[in-house]
Amino acid sequence: MTVRVRIAPSPTGNLHIGTARTAVFNWLFAHHHGGTFVLRVEDTDLERSKPEYTENIKTGLQWLGLHWDEGPFFQTQRLDQYKAAIQTLLDQGLAYRCYCTPAELEAMREQQKANNQAPRYDNRHRNLTEAQRAEFEAQGRKPVIRFKIDDAQQIVWQDLIRGTMTWKGSDLGGDMVIARTPEGDESFGQPLYNLAVVVDDIDMQISHVIRGEDHIANTAKQILLYEALGAAVPQFAHTPLILNQEGRKLSKRDGVTSIDDFRQMGFLPQAIANYMSLLGWTPTDSTQEIFTLEEAAKEFSLERVNKAGAKFDWDKLDWINAQYLHQMPIPALTDLLIPYLQAAGYGDYLGDRPWLESLVALVAPSLTRLADVTQETRLLFGDSITLDEKATAQLQTEGVKVILQEILQNIQASTNFTPDEAKALINQATKAHGVKKGVVMKSMRAGLMGELQGPDLMQSWVLLHQKGWDIERLNQAIASI
């Protein structure tokens, strides 16, 4: 069998983490089998679909490395195909026009609720006479097209993740609406999701439909449509939902859910793709957690996708992202960090590329996300300091002023300042004044950075010295004592 899979987002919002995870699984499956990965944009919701969302989805998939082989195809450009399918179903007596008004449908639901019955359409317009139909149209009623569902029918399929799945026609809520608001006999208005998806999958020869478990009920309905249209039914695989920490489906209420959000927070695309591949799938070597999409595709199988929901683990994502950051060449990492430093107001300090790369090399081991760079480097820009409470107290320690003054004089005499020379100055001051080395180290950190915690002191000192900022800062610190 030639494997053809698709990712079919609706452009009613930015690329969501759930859609992206589904795209990852489809991409991995296609590449494992040497198949085709198709992008289809399901934009039939004209009110909510926006071109900017389409672009966001395409950009997000490409950013993640999920390049499609065919498409994008747009449902709004395929209305004739849907209308032809609807006409086929009408001609075969498998679909019909329903003229129920919203008020009638609401009254039906209220009566069912009062009778402790599940809400469903009672198929009341399935067998209208021509006279009844003419009367409804004379009243100006706009019909919908409904597909007939036999309540007694069983729908069975072998789900590639969940095994045998069985649904009854009676579980599907009555005859299904497949198009709304037709304009006369020759036009069927707007086709709805289940009909359009089936026609698309038939025309695009989709062999496997891999999507979230929230589509299981749709699958039962769609299988009936495949059969009614005389088409082969693709194989289905329903992936587990992504859950929040409370075990509920991850939603917008949880805050960060779009790929844009993750990108702005400083996650790398390869780290997100890596992590999403593990959201529900377990590699053969369960201890392996870092791999490229290509590496994951070599062993990806739906048999190793879990049925249970996958909890989104921020700590795990941070850890994976850090692994990629720490392995990245400094020049490439510097390029990625510059926008964050510019946004933080440090743009004036970024012109010296060798110095900037040295700064990045200093803080890189401390980075978990790209956005962390502003916090990790904030004490290393400019010729002035702001002393916090602990640094102020350290500078008030007896003898510190004299120590800093002597070190300052020695710095000014240095012609090639290195970390080793910085250590030598610390050791010299320690011996000369008979104090513990820690006192001198803490005092220098306070005087150079204004705080007692931060990056490696010697490396930081050298970077500051290369700009002449260490002298200015120490003068400021000494003046405050």
From Swiss-Prot:
Which keywords, in A-to-Z order, does the entry hold? Aminoacyl-tRNA synthetase, ATP-binding, Cytoplasm, Ligase, Nucleotide-binding, Protein biosynthesis
Short sequence motif 'HIGH' region: positions:
9-19
Pfam families the UniProt entry points to: Anticodon_2 (PF19269), tRNA-synt_1c (PF00749)
What positions does the entry give for ATP binding? K252
Q: Where is this motif: 'KMSKS' region?
A: 249-253
Q: Oligomeric state and partners?
A: Monomer.
User: What is the protein name stated in its UniProt record?
Assistant: Glutamate--tRNA ligase
What species does this protein belong to? Answer: Picosynechococcus sp. (strain ATCC 27264 / PCC 7002 / PR-6)
Q: Which gene encodes it?
A: gltX
